[in-house]
């Protein structure tokens, strides 16, 4: 697992909070489908809004098509008044995505990005010669970025363990 300093600060802030509310054990419904060598969200396949021809490689397509925006899961007033709720939802969603990817052969990157106002979870298959994230995560100065590997026989990062 890799993360930049900004994400480290967000996670430290999240850990320092005490929330006096019960957490619902229900997780987001994530359905992943393999098609044409790509691993895509089922919802994207039902309503595609991107074309593979618009991307230089499969990894770029996957990262754009497989973007789950946490603010779409909540009423706008809740999201704006409790922004760390979005990061919490992102971490829960990342674990759910990781579990779904463990059913497929190969290795995948699961990426969580959070800027204090919005949070997104993305994923892509790890392929030789294809990158989506910069090697140095500190270059993402406007957002916290966390990335970890998922797939068969890849353990969950301790941060995501129940």
Model-derived features with residue positions:
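N-terminal leader/targeting segments
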Residues: 1-70
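Extended hydrophobic/Leu-rich segments
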Residues: 14, 77-79, 100
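Alpha-helix capping and helix-coil boundary motifs
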Residues: 16, 79-82, 141, 146
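A short linear-motif detector with a strong N-terminal bias
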Residues: 18-19, 48-50, 89-92, 102-103
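Alpha-helical context
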Residues: 46, 50, 73-77, 86-88
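A short, surface-exposed helix-loop junction/capping segment
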Residues: 64-84
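A short, highly charged nucleic-acid-interacting micro-segment common to nuclease
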Residues: 80-94
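Acidic, proline/glycine-rich low-complexity IDRs
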Residues: 88, 95-162
């Amino acid at each position: 697992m890799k993360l930049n300093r900004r994400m480290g600060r967000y996670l430290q802030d999240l850990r320092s909070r005490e929330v006096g509310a019960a957490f619902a054990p229900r997780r987001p419904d994530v359905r992943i489908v393999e098609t044409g060598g790509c691993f895509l969200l089922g919802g994207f396949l039902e309503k595609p809004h991107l074309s593979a021809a618009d991307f230089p490689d499969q990894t770029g397509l996957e990262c754009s098509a497989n973007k789950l925006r946490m603010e779409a899961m909540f009423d706008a007033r809740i999201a704006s008044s409790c922004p760390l709720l979005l990061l919490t939802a992102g971490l829960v969603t990342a674990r759910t995505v990781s579990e779904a990817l463990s059913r497929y052969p190969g290795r995948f990157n699961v990426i969580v990005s959070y800027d204090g106002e919005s949070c997104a979870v993305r994923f892509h298959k790890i392929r030789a010669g294809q990158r989506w994230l910069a090697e140095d995560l500190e270059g993402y100065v406007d957002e916290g970025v966390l990335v970890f590997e998922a797939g068969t026989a890849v353990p969950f990062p301790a941060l995501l363990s129940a």
